[in-house]
């Protein structure tokens, strides 16, 4: 059995974990809304048409914010289409996903769903086909009390009190050639700056997220952030990061090492933000919103076939990745990476939430179930709140195609006000268990409350409606703790949650 060591000291603090890093995302895309959260006539539908079984699963994840309504969708979206009497709302062609949007679910309906699910809305405005004026208008509609055109329109549409949306995205992936209204960094910086000013003039309490690069692989990554922030730095609060990983070649060790890239991406964007801060002699700190992250590749060929056969239909079954066990391991490592960067990453959204590259799947007229990636997110959201600690891990390493010195044990530690400690750990080793020694001597006397393990002998194992518990967490073997040092058995290829409680 291999060995690794970890030192967790209460005084080695990264920062407070913003609960919003456990956010998610619902886009008007595929069956995320229609046939996902919303299915009138389903046995589980409530009086609004929203599926209660889906809401129950979302509540279990305890998602504090949900980004909405896009995504690529938002760059061609007119917010006015989604309010007012449903029978008067127009049907529109969605150029982002080649489907027809009925606007049957709009802002008012989604706000009710979010409230029932225990979430707040992170609303994205259209800075693709539209501009600062329309962004200002939707803030007035959503947040201004009364006495103006758009606030009175909201009241006339049945919502007396403001929605009170506090976090807003200034467009989506505006550097991407696939985006409606693609812009250069300078073009976007000007539009984002003016939109942010006008939106905050309407409601000074809001925060806004500027579009960073669509991924770290974009040819303009780095220069985009520098040029854009040089224009809008003082008026924005966050820069967005988006990143998806894939494993089409079946290289599990290389796939599980991809969080090395994620960590580099975060640190690079944080450094750029700080460089602009220094250049401007500013006291304002711009932090990060990692508002799209996940594994995404399983459904791409299927999507191309769907578009060939059924373009412009409503609620096409797009981006319906079926996640396997190794995907859950990488999602666990991505959550660990977010925790370890809690000093700069203040918002993050698992993309997405239901049916579309999602932890929750449904069948029209049928059941709802948790995919493999549901469980690491559930554990992190439940136990990963409090203070992120700068845990020092000493682990054997391996090399793969893209990375050298990849630690077999990828881990993070969190403590709360009561002095309890939770360690999250992924064992990337395909063959061997690890004996993990965790030095906790700086804390008061602790006991091992629980060891949760997620493991499967088949890295391609999945959950289905017929077999929804094929890949699920189980009780681990635990371990011992003596004089402040714990020894825990970490199985090969596993996700682990080790909870210590103060005596």
Predicted regions and their residues:
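Non-catalytic accessory regions flanking glycosidase/transglycosidase catalytic cores in CAZymes
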Residues: 1-224, 229-238, 262-263, 267-307, ...
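Active-site His/acidic residue clusters
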Residues: 242-258
């Amino acid at each position: 059995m291999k060995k690794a060591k970890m030192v967790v000291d209460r005084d080695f603090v990264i920062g407070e974990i913003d609960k919003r890093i456990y956010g998610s995302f619902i886009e008007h895309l595929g069956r995320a809304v229609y046939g996902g959260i919303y299915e009138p006539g389903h046995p589980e539908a409530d009086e609004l048409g929203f599926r209660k079984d889906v809401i129950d699963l979302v509540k279990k994840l305890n998602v504090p914010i949900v980004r909405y309504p896009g995504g690529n969708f938002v760059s061609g979206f007119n917010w006015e289409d989604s309010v007012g009497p449903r029978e008067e709302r127009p049907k529109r062609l969605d150029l982002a996903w080649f489907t027809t949007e009925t606007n049957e679910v709009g802002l008012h309906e989604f706000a009710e769903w979010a409230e029932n699910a225990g979430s707040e809305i992170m609303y994205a405005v259209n800075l693709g086909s539209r501009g600062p004026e329309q962004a200002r208008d939707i803030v007035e509609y959503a947040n201004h009390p009364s006495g103006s055109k758009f606030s009175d329109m909201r009241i006339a549409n049945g919502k007396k009190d403001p929605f009170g949306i506090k976090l807003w995205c200034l467009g989506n992936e505006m550097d991407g050639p696939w985006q409606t209204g693609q812009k250069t960094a300078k073009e976007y910086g000007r539009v984002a700056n003016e939109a942010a000013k006008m939106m905050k003039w309407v409601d000074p309490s809001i925060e806004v997220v500027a579009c960073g690069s669509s991924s770290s692989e974009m040819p303009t990554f780095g220069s985009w952030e520098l040029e854009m922030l040089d224009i809008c730095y003082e008026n924005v609060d966050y820069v967005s990061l988006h990143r998806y990983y894939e494993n089409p070649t079946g290289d599990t060790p290389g796939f599980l090492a991809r969080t090395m890239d994620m960590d580099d991406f975060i640190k690079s964007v944080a450094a750029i933000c700080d460089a602009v801060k220094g250049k401007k002699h500013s006291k304002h700190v711009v932090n990060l919103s990692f508002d799209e992250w996940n594994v995404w590749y399983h459904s791409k060929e299927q999507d191309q076939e769907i578009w060939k056969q059924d373009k412009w239909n409503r609620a096409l079954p797009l981006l319906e990745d079926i996640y396997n066990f190794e995907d859950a391991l990488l999602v666990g490592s991505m959550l660990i990476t977010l925790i370890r960067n809690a000093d700069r990453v203040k918002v993050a959204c698992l993309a997405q939430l239901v049916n579309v590259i999602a932890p929750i799947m449904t069948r029209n007229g049928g059941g709802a179930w948790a995919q493999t990636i549901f469980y690491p997110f559930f554990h992190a959201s439940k136990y990963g709140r409090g203070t992120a600690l700068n845990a020092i891990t000493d682990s054997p390493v391996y090399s793969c195609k893209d990375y050298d010195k990849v630690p077999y044990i990828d881990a993070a530690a969190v403590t709360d006000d009561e002095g309890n400690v939770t360690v999250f750990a992924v064992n990337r080793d395909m063959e061997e268990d690890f004996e993990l020694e965790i030095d906790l001597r700086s804390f008061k006397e602790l006991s091992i409350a629980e060891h949760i393990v997620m493991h499967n002998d088949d890295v391609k194992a999945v959950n289905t409606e017929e077999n929804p518990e094929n890949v699920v967490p189980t009780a681990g073997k635990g371990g011992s703790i003596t004089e402040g040092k714990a020894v825990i058995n970490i199985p090969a290829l596993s996700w682990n949650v080790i909870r210590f409680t103060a005596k």
